[in-house]
């Protein structure tokens, strides 16, 4: 997002969370799965991890993702900088939440 100058769950090329997660290999051999995502950025003091987490917890949909009992795994990414503000001191955060039920692997 920072490099391409956008801030959204879907990138300029139309790739969304499911596309990105499929590309990571997380869903290989998976029977069922569920995903969620929170994104945020801040400039200056509001860019600290504490400030971002407080903002997410104060937002009903973001808080729901964080506390959702169905999610069992999380991936967290932090990149220096803010989308569309190349000279600003800040950070951009993504948390991807997931749960999956894997296919059993046949033993030889």
Name these PLM-found stretches:
Residues 1-24:
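Secreted/periplasmic proteins that engage bacterial cell-wall peptidoglycan
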Residues 16-102:
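A well-ordered secondary-structure block
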Residues 106-108:
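Composition-driven, intrinsically disordered low-complexity tracts enriched in small residues
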């Amino acid at each position: 997002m920072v490099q391409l100058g956008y801030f959204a769950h879907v990138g300029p090329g139309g790739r969304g969370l499911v596309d990105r997660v499929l590309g990571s290999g997380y869903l290989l051999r998976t029977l069922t799965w569920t995903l969620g995502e929170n994104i945020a950025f801040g400039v200056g003091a509001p860019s600290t991890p504490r400030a971002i987490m407080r903002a997410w917890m104060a937002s009903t949909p973001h808080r729901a993702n964080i506390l959702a009992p169905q999610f069992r795994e999380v991936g967290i990414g932090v990149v220096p900088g803010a989308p569309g503000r190349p000279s600003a001191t800040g950070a951009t955060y993504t948390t991807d939440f997931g749960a999956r039920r894997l296919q059993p692997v046949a033993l030889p």
